[in-house]
């Protein structure tokens, strides 16, 4: 396949990912209302898992092809890129996004991200010989167990919080009462639950197919350009696979579901590192010990960015400019992180 055709297919996959992300946001919003999941759990499970389908496709395809550096780079680099989606969401919010969240549950979600990404770093320090059955890294299993426990904790706290938080001026959206946005109708309000679920499933299939196209064409373009697999996974592929989070995050903010916008990002980041377990099984060897210092650097940057926004929810600072202070700080850290990645590579 010629380079222009590869580029065209790559861009087509990116566009399909974006459009599917918009539909995922709308259908998840509608399913949350119909099924009563509540905002944070919906963002953590439904939209997070569906939004991670490109990463699922890329991880499976890369592991089958033995491109383990690309698989690891996309999973870890995606955390950095997707956290920066909160900067984009901040641009569309009337006040700083972390000011509007008005709940400590996203703080729990942020802490969950920090813990599972820390396990990624620990897994990278283990030798490949330390593996269950010679195939699976103990860290990969620990990540899945911690993520599952985190889901349970978030749900229990959401249903029966031991504390009451009063944040004046907050406009979280669901589950307490939807923030009213003039002239913005609720998505799929007149459709049946079965119809909404079908549209959700179709959007998931499109997202998954687009992820396969992105991996195949992205890998081909990288080979021709001589780009390192980690750098490719952490930059162009991570940006392309973050398109569902960008589209769904903007849509959530537009609908007034500010907690969902944050829950989408934190939930997706926490879930996608669970994909190291299937990557181990498919590759037949632990992937994390092969991640290298570039991925360790990216994971560290991801932890710092997550901590910035987690603290921002508690501090609730007003914006000095078009962006909140946490988003401004995140931009600085991101720029330094990319500069460091280029330097290390």
Feature roles, as predicted:
Residues 1-345:
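Hydrophobic alpha-helical segments, chiefly the membrane-spanning helices
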């Amino acid at each position: 396949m010629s380079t222009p055709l590869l580029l065209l297919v790559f861009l087509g996959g990116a566009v399909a990912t974006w459009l599917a992300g918009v539909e995922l946001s709308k259908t998840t919003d509608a399913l949350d209302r119909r099924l009563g999941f509540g905002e944070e759990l919906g963002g953590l499970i439904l939209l997070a898992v569906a939004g991670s389908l490109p990463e699922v496709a890329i991880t499976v395809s890369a592991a089958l092809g033995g491109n383990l550096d690309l698989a690891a780079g996309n999973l870890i680099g995606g955390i950095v890129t997707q956290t920066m989606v909160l900067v984009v969401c901040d641009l569309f919010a009337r006040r700083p996004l972390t000011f509007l969240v008005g709940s400590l549950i996203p703080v729990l979600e942020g802490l969950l991200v920090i813990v599972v990404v820390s396990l990624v770093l620990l897994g990278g320090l283990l030798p490949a010989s330390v593996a269950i059955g010679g195939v699976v890294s103990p860290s990969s299993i620990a990540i899945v167990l911690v993520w599952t426990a985190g889901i349970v904790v978030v749900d229990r706290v959401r249903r029966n919080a031991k504390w009451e938080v009063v944040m004046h001026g907050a406009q979280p959206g669901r589950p307490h009462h939807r923030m009213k946005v003039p002239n913005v109708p609720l998505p799929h309000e007149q459709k049946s639950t079965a119809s909404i679920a079908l549209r959700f499933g179709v959007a998931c299939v499109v997202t998954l197919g687009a992820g396969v196209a992105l991996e195949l064409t992205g890998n081909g373009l990288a080979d021709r350009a001589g780009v390192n697999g980690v750098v490719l996974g952490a930059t162009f592929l991570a940006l392309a696979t973050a398109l569902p989070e960008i589209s769904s995050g903007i849509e959530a903010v537009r609908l007034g579901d500010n907690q969902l916008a944050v829950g989408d990002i934190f939930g997706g980041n926490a879930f996608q590192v669970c994909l190291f377990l299937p990557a181990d099984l498919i590759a037949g060897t632990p992937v994390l010990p092969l991640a290298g210092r570039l991925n360790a650097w990216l994971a560290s940057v991801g932890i710092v960015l997550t901590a910035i926004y987690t603290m921002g929810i508690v501090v609730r600072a007003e914006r000095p400019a078009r962006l909140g202070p946490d988003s401004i700080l995140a931009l600085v850290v991101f720029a330094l992180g990319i500069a460091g990645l280029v330097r290390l590579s």
